Amino acid sequence: MIGYYVKAENLKFKRTFSRKMIFIVPLINICFAFLMNPGFFVAGTYNWWSIIFMPVMIALLCALSHQKEKKASNYNGIFSSPVQLHMVWYAKISVIALYSLASQAVFLGFMVVMQFVIPQFSSIHLTVIAANLLLWLTTLWEIPICLWIARKFGFISAVLFNMLGSIVLGIMSASSPFWWLNPWSWPIRVMCPTIGIHPNGVPLENGDPLTSWVVVPPAVVLSVVLFAILARLTRRSFSPAVDRKSIKREAG
């Protein structure tokens, strides 16, 4: 059943900037990291990817999804159709999650190409591949909350919420013992053992406590659990009744 809704949602992204972002954002990230520090390229690229570019891309995908629906019919087309609204909401989340995964694959592909273009470039190994998968898993929770914020408060609010949350809150707590209390710190924290870089961008020395892989399982579990909770909670607001209440409040 969900497959039908996912296909329908995916078609809405046809010939849109959202699909182009899957290629554009990873490329911008790679170029930016190369210009910043070509001598420490791999670790720097993944550091910027986890702190800035990945959160911004997820927020943009969510905001653009909302913007497209709002411009098309202000969700009236969906609300007036004989569909299960919670399935539509889950499909929206699923499509953005798949696009996020696709961007990780594209990003990894660009990194593989770089090792053939630049002779001094370090080879891609299993931990680098694991870093991509971990980044995807630990950012899944951002999708339902950014979709909800985009519908509730608008395009800019969703982007600023996720970007500032990662840059400010994520970096602040990622290296602390209480990193697990802050969802934005999860993807940044798991980059420490996988890529060997501190959240502030400094390479970690061998034996540094931050290089311990013990943080990876709880980060993944916490993200998946929070993702499931937020997806279920936010689906309740996806209804014409809630939209009418919002319109009345704005009018008043």
Residue ranges and their predicted role:
Residues 65-73, 140-168:
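Cytoplasmic juxtamembrane interface segments
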Residues 15-38, 48-61, 158-173, 222, ...:
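Hydrophobic alpha-helical transmembrane segments of multi-pass membrane transport/permease proteins
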